[in-house]
Amino acid sequence: MSEVQQTKIKISEKAEGIVERDIKNNVIGRRELYIKVFHIGSGTISRKDMIKAIASSYGAQEDLVVIKKIHTLYGAGISYVRANIYNDKKTLQEFEPQYLIGRDTGQKVKKGGKGAQKQG
């Protein structure tokens, strides 16, 4: 039997994560991570803290890490995080939606509204 090695990620004083799946997708040029985060006694971890922890653990630039989803179990202090680490900025721009990129960097993405032009 082969033993699966799980990587631990220190996120903050009150939160620690275990990488359950680490998939290297060479076709797209990214690394896909599935992380189980334990934050018992504290709130859900922030995207910014997750990005910093992943980038430092994997030696990646913070602007190449995208948090796809954080799902927190009610009352359990456990979250499941889905993240991608891209090889370059161009690939990230091609595959990730702009709202996710803006969400992770803290930038506001301008949406259509009253002032938006209508297609005719």
Curated annotation (Swiss-Prot):
GO terms for molecular function: structural constituent of ribosome. The keyword Amino-acid biosynthesis does not apply. The keyword Chloroplast does not apply. This is Small ribosomal subunit protein eS24. One of its GO terms (cellular component) is ribonucleoprotein complex. InterPro entries: eRP_eS24_sf, Ribosomal_eS24, Ribosomal_eS24_CS, Ribosomal_uL23/eL15/eS24_sf. SUPFAM superfamilies: Ribosomal proteins S24e, L23 and L15e. It holds the Pfam family Ribosomal_S24e. It comes from the Archaea. Keywords: Ribonucleoprotein, Ribosomal protein. Belongs to the eukaryotic ribosomal protein eS24 family. Signal peptide: none annotated. GO terms for biological process: translation.
